[in-house]
Amino acid sequence: MSNPMKTALSLVPMVIEQTNRGERAYDIFSRLLKERIIFINGPVEDSMAMLVCAQLLFLEAENPKKEISLYINSPGGVVTSGMAIYDTMQFIRPPVSTLCMGQAASMGSLLLTAGAKGHRFTLPNARIMVHQPSGGFQGQASDIERHAQDIIKMKRRLNEIYVQHTGQDYEVIERTLDRDHFMTAEEAKQFGLVDDVIQYRAETEKEEKD
């Protein structure tokens, strides 16, 4: 069975630009990177995290003050991979705006809410889902116990991050994330995961002027 992500990447269109040195071809994502736009599309895992972190660091080196836009359509994925992206977003100097298109579930929702305050958006028909981390481990009893303790620590840390970025009390976050909790765009705004629901690009431009 073919990998749908690989199939999609093989169909990435090329953009041809005219320069004073002739024609130059870019794949569409490289061209958007020139506009300081980064995509998180699909499951969050190590190779994706490496690419996203590298792009964030490159754009910081290029201009440490100009905003970076992070577009998210992700079902979530590996916690450590997502935390690498999260930490890099907080580490770099440029503000990072986030926009959910399609869905931001699990780790995707954490990256969505981790954007710069006032610059976290979602499109009106996007879906946001939050929940506690999950995982499995096989081995001897003492090792299983240690892994269980570690995932409880990770759960606590993730809850603290949601508290920091949403403004909700810890108890509210813990209760909300206890099971898969789905939100509409408006519900995510009311919860504090995003700052606004936008339908047209002009609305984000107005936010920037304000």
From Swiss-Prot:
Pfam families (alphabetical): CLP_protease (PF00574)
PROSITE patterns in alphabetical order: CLP_PROTEASE_HIS, CLP_PROTEASE_SER
Active-site residues, as the UniProt record annotates them: 106, 131
Signal peptide: none
Reaction(s) this enzyme catalyzes, per UniProt: Hydrolysis of proteins to small peptides in the presence of ATP and magnesium. alpha-casein is the usual test substrate. In the absence of ATP, only oligopeptides shorter than five residues are hydrolyzed (such as succinyl-Leu-Tyr-|-NHMec, and Leu-Tyr-Leu-|-Tyr-Trp, in which cleavage of the -Tyr-|-Leu- and -Tyr-|-Trp bonds also occurs)
Subcellular localization: Cytoplasm
Protein name: ATP-dependent Clp protease proteolytic subunit
Annotated organism of origin: Bartonella quintana (strain Toulouse)
Source organism phylogeny: Bacteria, Pseudomonadati, Pseudomonadota, Alphaproteobacteria, Hyphomicrobiales
Gene responsible for this protein: clpP
